[in-house]
């Protein structure tokens, strides 16, 4: 994984363009997400724990929006109990950023495994989902147009084996104004504690405007249930960042 420091928004810009997962972001993404998302390391660790329990022999484990492959590796490294199996699960990472996929493939090669792994450069809205026992979307759905989110989750649920699991991690908003302001401000305090300046925070926020569209916890759980998951739980929250577990 790249450990280059995120300085993309360090200098004042006359006009801040829309955020893109381009070469610049791919180069510093590991630093960016660890300094921007409170609890990120814990989420990755628990994705591994969840994968160990719910991955099924011969089934597919999807990381949809895999970026540099942190979640992909968390899944794969917890499938070692299948190493001697003749019916191993297959791990499939998907991302539509060529810059991310290129680096992700390198990261997979640096940590070889006998678990079959494929990294695809595709739009997850058109990626075939088949024979799934695990599906992870780690801060991905928030970048999908609102009108297309439910169809995507329904397609995942329909093509998931009984007893399979989905992990959905998202930045959220709150209907309660006081809670929204308090946790929003605490998130910015977290970013300052990780070395981001007020200018960097403001410019990144501007870049993400209308690109990252958050929703409430209730909206996410209700959608997961409508999509076809029998159970949907909030299992993690740190300020305005959460993760859900949905069971088929």
UniProtKB/Swiss-Prot annotation:
GO BP, sorted A to Z: tRNA wobble uridine modification
Positions of S-adenosyl-L-methionine binding: 40, 65-67, 95-96, 123-124, 138, 205
Gene3D superfamilies in alphabetical order: Vaccinia Virus protein VP39
One Gene Ontology term of the molecular function aspect: S-adenosyl-L-methionine binding
Function as written in the Swiss-Prot or TrEMBL entry: Catalyzes the conversion of S-adenosyl-L-methionine (SAM) to carboxy-S-adenosyl-L-methionine (Cx-SAM).
Matching HAMAP family: Cx_SAM_synthase
NCBIfam families: carboxy-S-adenosyl-L-methionine synthase CmoA
Quaternary structure and interacting proteins, as annotated: Homodimer.
Protein name as annotated: Carboxy-S-adenosyl-L-methionine synthase
Organism: Hahella chejuensis (strain KCTC 2396)
């Amino acid at each position: 994984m790249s450990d280059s420091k995120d300085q993309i928004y360090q200098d004042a810009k006359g006009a801040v363009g829309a955020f893109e997962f381009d070469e610049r972001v791919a180069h510093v993404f590991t630093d960016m997400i660890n300094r921007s998302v409170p609890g990120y390391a814990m989420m990755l660790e628990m994705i591994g724990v969840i994968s160990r329990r719910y991955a099924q022999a011969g089934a597919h484990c999807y990381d949809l929006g895999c970026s540099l492959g942190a979640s992909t590796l968390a899944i794969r490294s917890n499938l070692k109990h299948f190493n001697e199996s003749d019916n191993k699960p297959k791990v499939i990472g998907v991302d539509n950023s060529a810059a991310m996929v290129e680096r992700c493939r390198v990261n997979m090669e640096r940590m070889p495994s006998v678990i079959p792994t494929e990294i695809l450069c595709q739009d997850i809205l058109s990626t075939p989902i088949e024979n799934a026992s695990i599906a992870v979307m780690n801060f991905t759905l928030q970048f999908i147009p609102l009108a297309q989110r439910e169809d995507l989750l329904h397609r995942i649920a329909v093509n998931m084996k009984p007893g399979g699991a989905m992990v959905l991690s998202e930045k959220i908003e709150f209907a309660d104004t006081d809670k929204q302001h308090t946790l929003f401000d605490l998130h910015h305090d977290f970013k300052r504690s990780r070395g981001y300046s007020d200018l960097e925070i403001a410019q990144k926020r501007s870049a993400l405007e209308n690109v990252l569209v958050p929703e409430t916890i209730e909206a996410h759980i209700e959608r997961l249930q409508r999509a076809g998951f029998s159970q949907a739980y909030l299992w993690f929250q740190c300020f305005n960042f959460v993760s859900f577990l949905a069971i088929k």
